[in-house]
Design a protein with these regions (language model features):
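Short acidic/histidine-centered micro-motifs embedded in hydrophobic/aromatic stretches
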Residues: 1-2, 16, 49, 53
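Amphipathic alpha-helical segments used for helix-helix packing
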Residues: 1-12, 59-60
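Amphipathic alpha-helical packing segments from all-alpha helical-bundle domains
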Residues: 8-34, 44-48
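Residue-level preference for long, well-ordered alpha-helices that form the structural scaffold
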Residues: 10, 14, 67-71, 75
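Short amphipathic alpha-helical interface segments enriched in basic and hydrophobic/aromatic residues
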Residues: 26, 30-33, 51, 55-62, ...
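Surface-exposed helix-capping loop/turn segments at secondary-structure junctions
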Residues: 31-40, 91-93
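Hydrophobic alpha-helical segments that form the core
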Residues: 39-60, 73-81
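C-terminal effector-binding regulatory domain of bacterial HTH transcription factors
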Residues: 69, 84-94
Length: 94
């Protein structure tokens, strides 16, 4: 709640829980693209597509711990779907 009352806390929250995660994953995706493991593209967009559902599911678990099992299943499904979208199969480069 304080992040909405205090601009400095809101900025800190955004940096810590959004921007840093996106930047970190974008760098991982840049490395994977360079290595030919995943398809190329906008690494920041890939990072947002990957991280946003994770942040959402963590938020659900924080507010409703009894839904942890459900959220973990959704997370597994998300990771599998994301992987199938970006992974280059041997002999199947775009």
């Amino acid at each position: 709640i304080e992040q909405f009352r205090s601009p400095s806390l809101g900025e800190l929250y955004t940096r810590r829980f959004s921007e840093r995660l996106v930047d970190y994953h974008a760098e991982i995706f840049r490395s994977l693209i360079a290595a030919g493991v995943i398809y190329g593209g906008d690494t920041n967009a890939l990072a947002l597509m990957y991280v946003a559902p994770v942040i959402t599911l963590i938020g659900v678990c924080d507010r409703q711990p009894e839904r942890e099992t459900e959220c973990l299943e959704k997370l597994k499904s998300h990771v599998k779907q994301f992987y199938s979208m970006v992974h280059i199969s041997v002999g199947n480069a775009r």
